[in-house]
Design a protein with these regions (language model features):
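Membrane-embedded alpha-helical bundles of multi-pass transporters/translocases
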Residues: 2-423
């Protein structure tokens, strides 16, 4: 039996630990900082809407640039590991710094226009800097998957596990960061939305997440050899479009951008219809908590189920067919959520409609989770395809396409939200 050059169990666990930590940090910002900007320092809605939109669109452009840099990297540690070793500390510092800002509401009440401008400017600068530093770690984190094993089976398995672990790390922070921050404020004898509790919570969670993230760099080994060829940034950008299979993945991902907006709308339904604009309201009323648990639980469980079964489905069917199946599932589930709302706009809190919506949230979760796994596997296949046909492995630039799709979709979604907020 032929020996395959692949990762050990310990190495797999170290990588997954890093993935867990990275997603903790990501959601400190996408959930915690977003709430902090909106409800704690009270940035104008239009300001933080445009900040998030512009930063994410810039990130989408910046990602391929970073991917090109990764592909040109040649060190004794490999192509991706240097960034995984050194980027967590930088991300940690910038993440914490983003929370150290003034209070816009207080500055406005005092008529201090200079402070108001400074607060908005620092919010924008720190968020853009965070996005750029996060990219330095994110592209190599996904790119190294195709470099630590030569086994297609092990790679697909690791991608699936990575998506599951990432969702767990994300979910842990999503459901806890605001509640922990407000609990700390109560312990400090402050208002629940005071800055101190959020800053302390951000520091604690970010340091823990960064320490775990470090494991992805220190605990892995790149096995797939580098070729001698390198490409300029211009050539790398051209390669993204020239490779037909990868081009199709990019186009498909961009065409799915409206589904990200639909996800935001679904979460808005959860936040404003059931929780009066504040998810922490669910912790004050048992019936609302149960409703949120059913709906959010359906979403997360759906993701975990699809991520777990995706490798088996891709073994039996073509990956693109599985991808299309999950894409269609999420689209249909979103449409049906809207139909249910039209049928019973004032009765969605009744148990029958809660169960129906819970099932539909489960369907959307399955769709999103399955698509994410299939997309990562197809990108890995494209790297092998390019190496087979042209002798060049574009690990960084191709996996930057995954981040490009995610951030471009999020940016377009945030842009639409910001536009609606100006109406």
């Amino acid at each position: 039996m032929e020996n395959v050059n692949t990762y050990s169990k310990k190495e797999r666990n170290m990588f997954l630990t890093g993935m867990f930590g990275q997603n903790m940090i990501y959601n400190v910002v996408t959930v915690g900082l977003y709430y902090y900007f909106q409800n704690v320092i009270c940035l104008p809605a239009i300001a933080f809407g445009w900040i998030f939109a512009i930063a994410r669109i810039w990130d989408a452009i910046n990602d391929p640039m970073m991917g090109s840099i990764v592909d040109k990297t040649r060190t004794k540690w490999g192509k991706c590991r240097p960034y995984l070793i050194f980027s967590p500390i930088v991300i940690c510092v910038i993440t914490i710094a983003a929370f150290f800002n003034g209070n816009y509401a207080n500055a406005k009440a005092n008529g201090n226009k200079t402070a108001m401008i400074f607060i908005v400017a620092w919010a924008a600068i720190s968020y853009v800097l965070w996005g750029m530093s996060y990219t330095v770690g994110d592209i190599p984190l996904w790119g190294i998957i195709s470099r630590i094993t030569e086994s297609e089976k092990d790679r697909s398995s690791l991608i699936s596990l990575s998506r599951i672990i990432a969702s767990i790390g994300a979910g842990l922070v999503v459901i806890s960061i605001v509640a922990v921050s407000q609990s700390l404020n109560s312990a400090f004898g402050l208002d629940t939305n005071a800055q101190k509790g959020f800053i302390v919570a951000a520091i604690i969670i970010t340091i823990i997440g960064s320490a775990l993230f470090e494991c992805a760099g220190t605990g892995t080994k790149e096995r797939v050899p580098n070729g001698s060829e390198t490409k300029t940034m211009k050539e790398s950008f051209a390669l993204m479009w020239k490779c037909k299979p990868f081009r199709r993945i990019l186009i498909s991902g961009l065409l799915r951008a409206p589904l990200q907006l639909m996800m935001n709308i679904a979460m808005t339904l959860l936040t404003y219809y059931y929780c009066k604009g504040n998810l922490t309201y669910a912790f004050t009323k048992l019936d609302i908590f149960i409703i949120v648990l059913i709906l959010a639980g359906g979403l997360f469980i759906g993701q975990f189920v699809s991520m777990a079964i995706s490798p088996a489905l891709m073994k039996k069917y073509e990956t693109k067919k599985v991808y299309n199946l999950f894409s269609g599932l999420s689209a249909v589930a979103f449409v049906l959520l809207f139909v249910v709302y039209l049928i019973a706009p004032t009765d969605l809190s009744k148990i029958g409609f809660v169960v129906i919506d819970g099932i539909l949230f489960f369907g959307t979760g399955m769709g999103f989770g399955g698509v994410n796994v299939c997309q990562s596997v197809m990108i890995s296949d494209c790297i092998d395809y390019e190496e087979y046909h042209n002798g060049y492995r574009p690990d960084g630039i191709f996996f930057s396409g995954q981040s490009f799709i995610t951030k471009f979709s999020a940016g377009i979604s945030s842009l639409f939200q910001a536009m609606f907020l100006t109406q």
